[in-house]
Swiss-Prot record:
This is Cytochrome b. The cytochrome bc1 complex contains 11 subunits: 3 respiratory subunits (MT-CYB, CYC1 and UQCRFS1), 2 core proteins (UQCRC1 and UQCRC2) and 6 low-molecular weight proteins (UQCRH/QCR6, UQCRB/QCR7, UQCRQ/QCR8, UQCR10/QCR9, UQCR11/QCR10 and a cleavage product of UQCRFS1). This cytochrome bc1 complex then forms a dimer. Belongs to the cytochrome b family. The lineage of its organism: Eukaryota, Metazoa, Chordata, Craniata, Vertebrata. Heme b b566 binds at H97, H196. The gene is MT-CYB. GO terms for molecular function: metal ion binding; ubiquinol-cytochrome-c reductase activity. One of its GO terms (biological process) is mitochondrial electron transport, ubiquinol to cytochrome c. The keyword Membrane applies. It is found in: Mitochondrion inner membrane. Heme b b562 binds at H83, H182. It comes from Capra ibex.
Length: 379
């Protein structure tokens, strides 16, 4: 008799994705971040659902409803901080996951990679709208500044901004629609993640060497199920250390002041995971130019597969490319630091140089390094 997990229409899907899936025997812990992102997504949807039960999306009561969650709702404080810091863990995993893809050449799976880029955009949009909901000073001014960037679009810009706002400023209509979008987007992200997996399972996973491993694949269960569970436990451990010891470490103190349209905070800045993009935005002294650079800083990932000039897939045996990769990582850390600094000398020039370096590394230096390596290997 055949096993039910191999014949039942629903269980067959689960079986082929998580149990009998042929997996490379040598994938490292860098391949854990996909499952960790799934864990984060489930955690965010669950904590978000319970927060939504007590939150009110009205400008008069939004701030106090969040305070009410923290003070009066049973374990409301832990749900709120798990959700806020869960977003930070989500982005740490996202950046690691994208970095892994860049390093080991996983971007050659075009459909999987491009859906991943769409997922990154969707997650950033969700996080931005979620940050607006507590209706603190940084929520309000962050929403005002970022939505205002759309006014840089020629001809339709101003109308577009007012349409998104639902009025002539960020107000009740804006907050209500942001709450609606923030609620629906994670489910769209879940659907996209399933498509992401679907395309990945068409080709099978890459591995650190970048060499096809079809000859010696192993079943996903029990080897990688246990590995993923260990990863998830470590993720939850780090998250709970943040939540229980320093819940406000990654937040902005300004967001504990209720939103006031008449009082602008001295330094408007987004959450830490957007600072690199914010630094690129600010480094260009032209509004439209800044907006384009901001979008291109993420959209450039779509070009990466077409800039791959190496004869090898992975960077594992390519020291010059490795050097370029770590230059890019250092540059992104520099941009993150600059994004949180005031707009004054010397930060302006450092930000501009780091922004140029970012695009130069991806568009010129990495493909050049690959070509040099090909020549050194006489390929």
């Amino acid at each position: 008799m055949t096993n039910i997990r191999k014949t039942h229409p629903l269980m067959k899907i689960v079986n082929n994705a998580f149990i009998d899936l042929p997996t490379p025997p040598n994938i490292s812990s860098w391949w854990n971040f996909g499952s960790l992102l799934g864990t984060c997504l489930i955690l965010q949807i669950l904590t978000g659902l319970f927060l939504a039960m007590h939150y009110t999306s009205d400008t008069m009561t939004a701030f106090s409803s969040v305070a009410h969650i923290c003070r009066d709702v049973n374990y409301g404080w832990i749900i709120r901080y798990m959700h806020a810091n869960g977003a930070s863990m989500f982005f740490i995993c996202l950046f690691m996951h994208v970095g892994r893809g860049l390093y080991y050449g996983s971007y050659t799976f075009l459909e999987t990679w491009n859906i991943g880029v769409i997922l990154l955009f969707a997650t950033m949009a969700t996080a931005f709208m979620g940050y607006v909901l507590p209706w603190g000073q940084m929520s309000f001014w962050g929403a005002t500044v970022i939505t205002n960037l759309l006014s840089a679009i020629p001809y339709i810009g101003t109308n577009l901004v007012e349409w998104i706002w639902g009025g002539f400023s960020v107000d009740k209509a804006t907050l209500t629609r942001f709450f609606a979008f923030h609620f629906i987007l994670p489910f769209i992200i879940t659907a996209l993640a399933m498509v992401h997996l679907l395309f990945l399972h068409e080709t099978g996973s890459n591995n650190p060497t970048g060499i096809p491993s079809d000859t010696d694949k192993i079943p996903f269960h029990p080897y990688y199920t246990i590995k993923d569970i260990l990863g998830a436990m470590l993720l939850i451990l780090v998250l709970m250390l943040l939540v229980l010891f320093t819940p406000d470490l990654l937040g902005d103190p300004d967001n504990y002041t209720p939103a006031n349209p008449l009082n602008t905070p001295p330094h408007i800045k987004p959450e830490w995971y957007f600072l690199f993009a914010y630094a690129i935005l600010r480094s260009i002294p032209n509004k439209l130019g800044g907006v384009l650079a901001l979008i291109l800083s993420i959209l450039i990932l779509v070009l990466v597969p077409f800039l791959h000039t190496s004869k090898q897939r992975s960077m594992m045996f390519r020291p010059i490319s490795q050097c370029m990769f770590w230059v890019l990582v250092a540059d992104l850390l520099t941009l993150t630091w600059i994004g949180g600094q005031p707009v004054e000398h010397p930060y302006i020039i450092i930000g501009q140089l780091a922004s140029i370096m970012y695009f130069l590394t991806i568009l010129v230096m990495m493909p050049a390094a690959s070509t040099i390596e090909n020549n050194l290997l006489k390929w």
